[in-house]
From Swiss-Prot:
Annotated InterPro entries: CitG, TriPribosyl-deP-CoA_syn
Record family assignment: Belongs to the CitG/MdcB family.
Keywords in alphabetical order: ATP-binding, Nucleotide-binding, Transferase
Pfam family, one: CitG
EC number of this enzyme: 2.4.2.52
Alphabetized GO MF terms: ATP binding; triphosphoribosyl-dephospho-CoA synthase activity
Name of protein: Probable 2-(5''-triphosphoribosyl)-3'-dephosphocoenzyme-A synthase
Lineage: Bacteria, Pseudomonadati, Pseudomonadota, Gammaproteobacteria, Pseudomonadales
Reaction(s) catalysed by this chain's protein: 3'-dephospho-CoA + ATP = 2'-(5''-triphospho-alpha-D-ribosyl)-3'-dephospho-CoA + adenine
GO biological process, one term: prosthetic group biosynthetic process
Function: Involved in the formation of 2-(5''-phosphoribosyl)-3'-dephosphocoenzyme-A, the prosthetic group of the acyl-carrier protein of the malonate decarboxylase.
Organism from which the protein derives: Pseudomonas aeruginosa (strain UCBPP-PA14)
Amino acid sequence: MNAIANLAATLRADLGECLADLAVDALIDEAELSPKPALVDRRGNGAHADLHLGLMQASALSLWPCFKEMADAAQRHGRIDARLRGVLGQLGRDGEAAMLRTTEGVNTHRGAIWALGLLVAAAALEPRRTQAGEVAARAGRIALLDDPAAAIGDSHGERVRRRYGVGGAREEARLGFPRAVRHGLPQLWRSREGGAGEQNARLDALLAIMSVLDDTCVLHRAGRVGLAAMQDGARAVLAAGGSASLAGRRRLCELDRRLLALNASPGGAADLLAACLFLDRLPAVSGGWAGSL
């Protein structure tokens, strides 16, 4: 019996490590993707005076233990209820504290901890069911539960949500990440099937999200004017053939210049792109552990 218990514990650890690896890889791949309009990438800081690519990479790596612990907690608990929600909330706050220690107080990935933490936990709950829509729907069920220990929010995102009447990251999660599942992922797959390279396919996925998302990061920095510039500009790139086409590339440069002039950085869309990359890879890597659980 001890050998069986030890094997089960090893398999659970492997699952948690794999999911944490996927989440961190998604964050790093999102950060390194270039050229992203007004976002930190290999070219520079975008619209952010306090961020750079190395900081984004270090921040992502600092979150590995947080994601691992979230996966382990979800697998141990085995069901979606208020107790699991409370545990995940505390782990998320601990992860945010670790991030802030790494970045010396700069908020690099607060929104990503929320989005990817939910998706990691959702994947760990039912490791044999890894299709994007199913995982996102489970994450939404977790997000619908309130965390009684959470502080009353007065973040930029919360203030923007109240001022402009938009849903923000909380609603996106509670709805099962529709901008990622219904817009980002389908565009990623279409661009790949159309012959675009992986980097261009990912850029197109980001643009698809930007075209429909009420991004609270953009609203905070540039209001409705900035949001319209982001959404209209992203649609124009895709309508011109996407980032892999010459016309689309020109439109992308125009969008980058416009958002930089407005100091508008689509950080919410970037978080959802990372969610897309996580969900996209999950079925391909799950075979190594799903069949053993």
